[in-house]
């Protein structure tokens, strides 16, 4: 079934086009429907970027903190830590 991959890449394309509302909805749908997908951790990082771009600092910080805690050794955790420091410093 390629539907989960399609949802993930659709959300990424919305993010790339700076269509943050659709990116947010699509990442959330992807996460709710695919909690064990191999791109799940990446989607948490990307959704936190969406939250930050929408001015939703608290949601971005909370999501990044939970992503780092749940996936401490994931390659996206390094980016998540950097983004968290950046958001907090703003």
Please provide the spans of the model-predicted regions:
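Acidic, polar-rich low-complexity tracts and alpha-helical solenoid repeat scaffolds
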Residues: 1-90
């Amino acid at each position: 079934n390629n539907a989960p991959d399609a949802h993930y890449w659709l959300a990424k394309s919305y993010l790339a086009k700076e269509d943050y509302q659709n990116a947010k909805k699509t990442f959330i749908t992807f996460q709710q429907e695919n909690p064990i997908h191999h791109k799940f951790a990446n989607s948490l990082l990307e959704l936190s970027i969406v939250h930050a771009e929408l001015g939703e600092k608290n949601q971005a910080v909370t999501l990044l903190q939970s992503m780092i805690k749940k996936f401490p050794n994931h390659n996206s955790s390094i980016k998540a830590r950097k983004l968290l420091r950046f958001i907090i410093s703003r």
